[in-house]
Amino acid sequence: MPLYEHVFLARQDASTQQVEELTTQMTGIVEGLGGKVTKTENWGVRSLTYRMNKNRKAHFVLLNIDAPSAAIAEIERQERISEDVIRYLSVRVDELEEGPSAMMRKADRDRERDDRGGGFRGERDGGGFRGDRGDRGDRGPRRPRDEETADEE
């Protein structure tokens, strides 16, 4: 059977439970038509690049599907009918990605960065006079200041 990656965006004001119900409904459709969902990832609420149907944010969900094309057609038909789904995209792939997707790896990496305790670095030295920094090698010698212009001011 063909392999698909299917991503859908649900409205921001839909609860997490409603998004999980949508995901369960899509999984049920696939399994009812002889396929299987090998991986489900909920990427959470993320900002959209541009407004879609008056929404600035959406719940992102990824499904890795091993199913006939009729199952994908039925999923897309149901998502067109559903008011909670803003957009969807199904892509046929040669092989499904094992382990977490790129979005989940990014989320894990961001979480690790937060755990490092960065942020406030305490009091810093410096910020005042740094002394003579020497000549700039990329410029010629400085021209002398005019004594006359300094006296006039």
UniProtKB/Swiss-Prot annotation:
<dbReference type="InterPro" id="IPR020814">
    <property type="entry name" value="Ribosomal_S6_plastid/chlpt"/>
</dbReference>
<dbReference type="Pfam" id="PF01250">
    <property type="entry name" value="Ribosomal_S6"/>
</dbReference>
<comment type="similarity">
    <text>Belongs to the bacterial ribosomal protein bS6 family.</text>
</comment>
<keyword id="KW-0694">RNA-binding</keyword>
<dbReference type="GO" id="GO:0022627">
    <property type="term" value="C:cytosolic small ribosomal subunit"/>
</dbReference>
<dbReference type="GO" id="GO:0070181">
    <property type="term" value="F:small ribosomal subunit rRNA binding"/>
</dbReference>
<keyword id="KW-0687">Ribonucleoprotein</keyword>
<keyword id="KW-0699">rRNA-binding</keyword>
<dbReference type="GO" id="GO:0006412">
    <property type="term" value="P:translation"/>
</dbReference>
<protein>
    <recommendedName>
        <fullName>Small ribosomal subunit protein bS6</fullName>
    </recommendedName>
</protein>
<feature type="compositionally biased region" description="Basic and acidic residues">
    <location>
        <begin position="105"/>
        <end position="147"/>
    </location>
</feature>
<dbReference type="InterPro" id="IPR035980">
    <property type="entry name" value="Ribosomal_bS6_sf"/>
</dbReference>
<comment type="function">
    <text>Binds together with bS18 to 16S ribosomal RNA.</text>
</comment>
<keyword id="KW-0689">Ribosomal protein</keyword>
<feature type="region of interest" description="Disordered">
    <location>
        <begin position="97"/>
        <end position="153"/>
    </location>
</feature>
<dbReference type="InterPro" id="IPR000529">
    <property type="entry name" value="Ribosomal_bS6"/>
</dbReference>
<dbReference type="InterPro" id="IPR014717">
    <property type="entry name" value="Transl_elong_EF1B/ribsomal_bS6"/>
</dbReference>
<dbReference type="GO" id="GO:0003735">
    <property type="term" value="F:structural constituent of ribosome"/>
</dbReference>
